[in-house]
């Protein structure tokens, strides 16, 4: 009779140093360190860059680096970084994949309708604000202009303010 020795390597599990991230377009992500529950393991990751995103890294090893991501669309885009750990040694055992996500929200562009408005003193403005980015909220501030009164900071998608010109000149 013979005695055989069999070594069973544990299946490595990838762990991420921080929770998934959500950023605004043009902002930098934070670096994410990848580790594993198994001491002797190599970690690699890949990311498929989706249309509408620039600045994304596509592959690496133990760190998802700082990236300045730009979303050129009007909708949020989520990048998924798929990581795998593989034990080292004579029996290299891959673990299950783990996914880390970074969502990049678009930069809303504001349109005003009408873009230019002329009113009589005492009349109200009626300027509608819109954006193609769903969920956009609007706020505005005003700059004091000579003898115009009635303007105020505000928020919402309609600027409606009764403005008074106490001078004899258009302003």
At which residue positions do the language-model features occur?
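Extracellular low-complexity Ser/Thr/Asn/Gly-rich intrinsically disordered segments
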Residues: 1-171
């Amino acid at each position: 009779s013979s005695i055989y020795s069999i070594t069973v390597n544990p299946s490595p599990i990838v762990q991420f140093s921080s929770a998934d991230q959500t950023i605004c377009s043009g902002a930098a992500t934070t670096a994410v360190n990848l580790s594993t529950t198994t001491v002797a393991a190599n970690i690699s990751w890949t990311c498929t860059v989706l249309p509408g995103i620039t600045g994304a890294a596509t592959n690496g090893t133990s760190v998802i680096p700082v990236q300045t991501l730009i979303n050129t669309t009007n909708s949020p885009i989520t990048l998924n970084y798929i990581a795998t750990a593989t034990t080292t040694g004579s029996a290299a055992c891959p673990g299950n994949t783990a996914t880390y996500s970074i969502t990049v929200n678009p930069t809303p562009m504001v349109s005003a309708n009408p873009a230019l408005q002329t009113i009589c003193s005492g009349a109200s403005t009626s300027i509608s604000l819109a954006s193609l980015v769903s969920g956009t909220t609007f706020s505005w501030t005003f700059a004091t202009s000579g003898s115009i009164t009635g303007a105020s900071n505000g928020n919402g998608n309609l600027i409606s303010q009764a403005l008074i010109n106490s001078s004899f000149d258009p302003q």
